[in-house]
Amino acid sequence: CTVMALSRYESDERIPDKFLMDALLERLGFQPSKYEFVASDQEFEYSMKRAQIEKLLYEKRDVQACREALQEYEKQVQEKERLHRQYILLKKGLILGREEKYSDAINVFEQALKCTECSETNVANQTDILLTNTETELLYLIGKFLYIDGKKKDACTYFRMLKNQMEQRPAGKEKWKEYYPCILYRLAQCEFEAYNYGASYALQIHIVPSDI
């Protein structure tokens, strides 16, 4: 959020909704699931829609039903509700990935990052930038799909960027658990294929850090 908006939150002139509060906590390295919030009816409905989408996508693996649920969710979201639009684009990109349409998925992920004015350039050039879990996932998935699509050099640019970001922000260790070992593994593969065996080994021995 902007400095002005943050000032209003701090002075109780404005109250962030649940999803914005989640994003702010994630940027600070905290897990929103460890905190309790009083949600409005609209926020509760959005939460239920997300739960339905997650179940359809990951448990039932019903792509068509998931796509329809996303369309219903999207109808309720206003243009200014950027965090919700970002979430919808993330899931749309994941569906495209399931269909092996990796280039299309990457384009959708890049659109999603723009919802919060986040980009590979911003993250690479700003050492003090704080990422939400969704932004971290989007950047990781861009790298992953680039790698699968054979664009390994471009993929490693994203993986190195995220590795540096995670190591500079130890407060956000919850974000490491899913992505950090995968990032090290992909980077180790890239170094091995470039005949940099020492660098590859150095990455491999840290794939399961003791502090994760």
Spans of features found by a protein language model:
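Amphipathic alpha-helical segments of tetratricopeptide repeats
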Residues: L70-V77, E110-A124, T157-G172, Y201-D211
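DNA major-groove recognition helix of helix-turn-helix/homeodomain DNA-binding modules
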Residues: F19-K34
